[in-house]
Regions:
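Internal insertion modules embedded within essential enzymes
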Residues: 5-11, 98-101, 107-269, 281-286, ...
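Short, contiguous pre-domain boundary segments
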Residues: 1-23
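Interfacial "coupling" helices/loops that link adjacent transmembrane helices in transporter permeases
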Residues: 546-575
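Hydrophobic packing positions in regular secondary-structure scaffolds
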Residues: 71-72, 76, 80-83, 94, ...
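Catalytic palm subdomain of template-directed nucleic-acid polymerases
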Residues: 81-89, 216-217, 272-286
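Short, mixed-charge amphipathic alpha-helical segments
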Residues: 17-33, 89-101
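Divalent-cation-assisted or electrostatically stabilized phosphate/pyrophosphate-binding catalytic cores
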Residues: 47-58, 94, 103, 162-172
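Alpha-helical phosphate/pyrophosphate-handling elements in metalloenzyme active cores
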Residues: 32, 36, 42-76, 81, ...
């Protein structure tokens, strides 16, 4: 990002930037929203002591940096007016700025209104709301990401406990979503800012260690760039090269995951080469490998097989000899790929506005639609949170169908996950799998490059409850549970009843004393159930844990007994 916490765009510069990438009179909408928000927030101040309007102004500046359309920028300027400004309603926004801007403001406002006593449940519902918002209009999430980025930049003005909570939520929810949308410019800053508050000592130590050898490292980078640039000039390849240190959180995460001290983390820098065409990318790759020794297993071709978030680039890690006597990464991509690498889905939005690439944009967001498909079947908030975090954070593997189509899936996915990824009917009728021509168990972890063939049978009775355990992706698990829920309701009820009663007895409780309407009514209301059998069915098909059900009933029992005692009833009367 060009603009820091100390510098937001003045109105004249904001309008000039918008006119440059969005010709026409759209800038007038931005100007009107700017002046409206400035007036609406005129007597309000942030905890930093700054006028409140600095916040929506920064949010809009970030959205302009992403080259987003005028309605999105206007909504960024107005996003807090309905919630925080007396006399301004959604109808006011609709009348002044139109339905599109009002819809975006409403979407952001709804994301701000989540309030749960249970922090984990609140986090799960935050994620659920954000995914639903993505399905309706991805721009709502882009505004929310810009909003969170500026709030993180000014987080030091909050109390310490709140700083840590906000930073953790940012790292768990906002940064992964920015990653999935390919908006690395926001994702990396969110991660570094979060680390500063979650582990301040570790962060400061890391900053200090990275800074200690900065001058030496910068000199090494300069020599490597000069050497590579000279070779590219000889081949008449138009290029731009820059060197940059890896961002702090990526270094920190590598130290934690690999359990290595800072001194044993070598690839701390990346050289980025930007060229005009795809053939030039591969030509540069060849030159890099002639200049320096390639490290085995460290080459990735994201041009021929792009990531799900549209990222394309060639990555290779090499050792630079005397001039750079440690490994460093070289990333090679075109200018267009670089624009998408920095701004992700935001880079595509203006093309959709023109109508030229709407279908392509929609296809890039297939994972959002998948999550929307299965989230409604996931009753338990904690399960939803855990599975979605896995889906957002996980690395990808790239697999081939028998016809040669490429399918990306989370690392650790099995042939059964692959089957359900193709279609629910394929998964439900799956009886076996072949990996690279060999029959393999359905729980085999798949690796990049595997050719996967699913064997089906029309006579298959469908999935069993064990398949939920075999599958690693929440999408496949949700489809299996949906099948079990529909096809085996009576069996699920009996299984669930037995599991709940067994859990009661395990705790030394008499089931009839605990399984009472007044104790399970809160579960019915929370999940939209109508009868106890719905709870049993959910437990039976794996959609809800018996431990959770019994815990909720016991908690409710204790609460009600405590209330009666407070009112003066004796134990005998309560019993």
């Amino acid at each position: 990002m060009t603009y820091t916490v100390y510098e937001a765009m003045p109105l004249s510069q904001m309008l000039a930037r918008v006119q440059k990438y969005y010709p026409g009179d759209g800038y007038k909408l931005v100007e009107k929203a700017y002046l409206f928000a400035q007036e609406a927030h005129k007597d309000q101040y942030r905890k930093s002591g700054e006028p409140y309007f600095t916040h929506p102004c920064f949010v809009a500046s970030i959205l302009v940096e992403l080259s987003l359309d005028p309605p999105t920028i206007a909504a960024g300027l107005l996003h807090d007016t309905v919630e925080d400004c007396e006399g301004i309603t959604l109808d006011t926004i609709r009348q002044e700025f139109g339905e599109e801007v009002a819809m975006l403001v409403d979407g952001v406002t709804k994301l701000n209104k989540l309030d749960f006593a249970d922090k984990e449940e609140a986090q799960a519902e935050s994620l659920r709301k954000m995914i639903l918002a993505m399905g309706k209009d991805i721009r709502v999430i882009l505004i929310k990401l810009a909003d969170r980025l500026h709030n993180m930049r000014t987080l030091k003005f909050q109390k310490e406990e709140r700083r840590v909570a906000i930073a953790r939520e940012t790292l768990d929810i906002y940064a992964p979503i920015a990653h999935r949308l390919g908006v690395y410019a926001i994702k990396q800053e969110l991660e570094d800012l979060s680390l500063r508050y979650i582990d301040p000592v570790g962060y400061e130590n890391l900053v200090q260690k990275v800074g200690q050898k900065r001058s030496e490292r910068e000199e090494n980078i300069r020599m490597v760039i000069d050497e590579l640039s000279a070779k590219l000039d000889e081949q008449h390849i138009h290029h731009t090269i820059d060197g940059r240190p890896k961002h702090f959180y990526s270094i920190y995460r590598k130290m934690v995951l690999q359990n290595k001290p800072f001194d044993q983390i070598y690839d701390l820098i990346a050289i980025r080469v930007l060229v005009d065409s795809v053939p030039d990318c591969y030509a540069v790759l060849g030159i890099v490998h002639t200049l320096w020794n390639q490290m085995p297993g460290r080459f990735k071709d994201y041009i021929s097989v792009p990531k799900a978030n549209m990222y394309q680039s060639l990555h290779t890690t090499v050792v630079g000899g005397r001039k750079m006597p440690f490994p460093f990464e070289v990333q090679i991509r075109t200018w267009e790929m670089h624009r998408i690498a920095e701004y992700g889905i935001a880079a595509h939005w203006r093309y959709k506005e023109g109508g030229g690439a709407a279908n392509d944009l929609d296809s890039k967001l297939y994972w959002v639609r998948q999550i929307l498909d299965w989230q409604s079947d996931t009753r338990d908030s904690r399960e939803f949170l855990d599975t979605l975090k896995t889906d957002l954070f996980s690395e990808e593997v790239f697999l081939f169908t028998p016809k040669g189509d490429v399918i990306s899936m989370p690392k650790g996915a099995t042939p059964l996950d692959f089957a359900y990824r193709i279609h629910s009917a394929v998964g439900n009728k799956c009886v076996g799998s072949k990996i690279n021509g060999r029959i393999m168990p359905l729980d085999t972890p798949l690796e990049t490059g595997d050719r996967v063939e699913i064997i089906t049978s029309a006579s298959s009775k469908g999935p069993s409850a064990d398949w939920v355990r075999i599958c690693k992706t929440p999408q496949a698990q949700a489809k299996i549970r949906a099948f079990l829920k529909k096809e085996y309701r009576e069996e699920n009820i009996e299984t669930g009843r037995a599991m709940v009663e067994r859990e009661c007895r395990r705790r030394g409780l008499n089931p009839p004393d605990v399984i009472k309407p007044e104790y399970y009514d809160s579960i019915l209301k929370k999940y939209g159930f109508t009868a106890l059998n719905d709870i049993y069915s959910a437990v039976g098909y794996g959609g809800m844990a018996s431990v959770y059900v019994v815990s909720r009933m016991v908690d409710e029992q204790r609460t009600q007994i405590g209330t009666l005692k407070a009112l003066g009833y004796s134990d005998g009367a309560i019993a």
